[in-house]
Curated annotation (Swiss-Prot):
It comes from the Bacteria. GO terms for cellular component: cytoplasm. This is Metallothiol transferase FosB 2. It comes from Bacillus anthracis. Coiled coil: none annotated. The lineage of its organism: Bacteria, Bacillati, Bacillota, Bacilli, Bacillales. SUPFAM superfamilies: Glyoxalase/Bleomycin resistance protein/Dihydroxybiphenyl dioxygenase (SSF54593).
Amino acid sequence: MLQGINHICFSVSNLEKSIEFYQKILQAKLLVKGRKLAYFDLNGLWIALNVEEDIPRNEIKQSYTHMAFTVTNEALDHLKEVLIQNDVNILPGRERDERDQRSLYFTDPDGHKFEFHTGTLQNRLEYYKEDKKHMTFYI
């Protein structure tokens, strides 16, 4: 039986650069660092970085796959400034209805996509129930 997410692992090309990103941008606490790995605690979530130097990374740019973090509206504005000050690659956001709340998409040094999002699953479901009549809801 599944009990929850155990950890999330990202393949990185430069461990030092990635450690700096995860500490400075995501405010993750570095727990251990090896020659080719690092582990972080991000508000109780175990984040693992493993160095893989010679793998293709172009497909990352072609996918919408990402990890999203919940933030407040006030924090989103501050976090955008942090991203800008640290020369983080900010992605153009997709067009969205204001009922879908606010988001800011960006990448880590290896192109993994992240999102700061001000909404909740409940917000999203309520919006979809109002506006997306083609959808089937099971709750």
